């Protein structure tokens, strides 16, 4: 069994895998890390490996405390990945983005793939049908857009995510919701349209904390999976074992 962990900017997601099957997903706060990992291991005592995407120094020490029980692996740029990294600055490419690209390469072979991760930031990562990682884009996520409007203006309120009533906002709150949510959706659809106009045999994978909210609002056909990173971690780790 493998325990995969995704340390996000706000929360931690985890999953236990046996082979290619997921047994259970978990979500918890960063300050609960060690306690919750201990609980997971009590429930799944046959876990042999702990695999982590990207992590800060504080969290890393917490994970290392489990080294006596598990094989602990932090993915780095030195690991083997199932794609050719054509990024102009490969060492600056986030490990989480590399894991997503690896998962897309392994799950959807011989296709052009665009992975969209809608979290604190939204990232776009493109892997062509020849398994070349070419790059993508980064822009603010939904929450960051709400916070930016509040923090960098004198009077605009800080709102939480909500579906706008219309694209024409008839109040300040509705105008903000329309600008943030509709603008976000138009951005994603615009990127997808641009890729579609240049590449055929194409699949779009949408993941991240806001994936479910966005999936039903996009005009393009997508494969939505909010746990794609955790699944990709398990698959990429198995790929590493098989190819080391």
Swiss-Prot record:
Enzyme class, first EC level, given as a word: transferase
Major place of residence: cytoplasm
Residues holding substrate: 87, 94-97, 172
Subcellular localization(s) per the UniProt record: Cytoplasm
Note accompanying the cofactor annotation: A monovalent cation. Ammonium or potassium.
EC number from the UniProt entry: 2.7.1.33
Record keyword ATP-binding present: yes
Residues reported in the UniProt entry to bind K(+): 117
Active site residues according to the UniProt entry: 96
Binding site for ATP: 6-13, 120
Keywords: ATP-binding, Coenzyme A biosynthesis, Cytoplasm, Kinase, Metal-binding, Nucleotide-binding, Potassium, Transferase
GO annotation, biological process: coenzyme A biosynthetic process
Reactions this protein catalyses: (R)-pantothenate + ATP = (R)-4'-phosphopantothenate + ADP + H(+)
Single GO term (MF): ATP binding
Pathway: Cofactor biosynthesis; coenzyme A biosynthesis; CoA from (R)-pantothenate: step 1/5
Gene Ontology cellular component terms for the protein in this record: cytoplasm
CDD domains the UniProt entry points to: ASKHA_NBD_PanK-III (cd24015)
Similarity comment: family membership: Belongs to the type III pantothenate kinase family.
HAMAP family: Pantothen_kinase_3 (MF_01274)
Subunit structure: Homodimer.
Protein's name in the database: Type III pantothenate kinase
Organism: Flavobacterium johnsoniae (strain ATCC 17061 / DSM 2064 / JCM 8514 / BCRC 14874 / CCUG 350202 / NBRC 14942 / NCIMB 11054 / UW101)
The encoding gene: coaX
């Amino acid at each position: 069994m493998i325990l995969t962990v995704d340390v996000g900017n706000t929360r931690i997601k985890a999953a236990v895998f046996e082979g290619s099957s997921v047994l259970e997903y978990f979500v918890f706060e960063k300050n609960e890390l060690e306690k919750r990992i201990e609980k997971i291991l009590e429930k799944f005592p046959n876990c042999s490996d702990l695999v982590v995407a990207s992590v800060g120094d504080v969290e890393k020490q917490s994970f290392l405390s489990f080294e006596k029980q598990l094989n602990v692996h932090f993915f780095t740029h030195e690991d083997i990945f199932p794609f050719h990294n054509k990024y102009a600055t490969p060492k600056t490419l986030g490990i989480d983005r590399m894991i997503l690209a690896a998962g897309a390469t392994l799950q959807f072979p011989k296709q052009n793939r665009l992975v969209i991760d809608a979290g604190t930031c939204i990232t776009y990562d493109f892997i062509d049908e020849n398994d070349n990682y070419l790059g993508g884009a980064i822009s603010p996520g939904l929450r960051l857009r709400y916070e930016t409007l509040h923090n960098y203006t004198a009077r605009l309120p800080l709102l939480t995510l909500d579906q706008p009533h219309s694209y024409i906002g008839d109040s300040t709150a509705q105008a903000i919701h329309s600008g943030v949510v509709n603008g976000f959706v138009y951005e994603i659809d615009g990127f997808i349209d641009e890729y579609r106009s240049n590449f055929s045999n194409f699949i779009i994978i949408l993941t991240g904390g806001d994936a479910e909210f966005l999936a039903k609002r996009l005009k393009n056909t997508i494969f939505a999976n909010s746990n794609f990173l955790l699944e990709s971690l398990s698959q990429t780790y198995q790929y590493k074992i098989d190819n080391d």
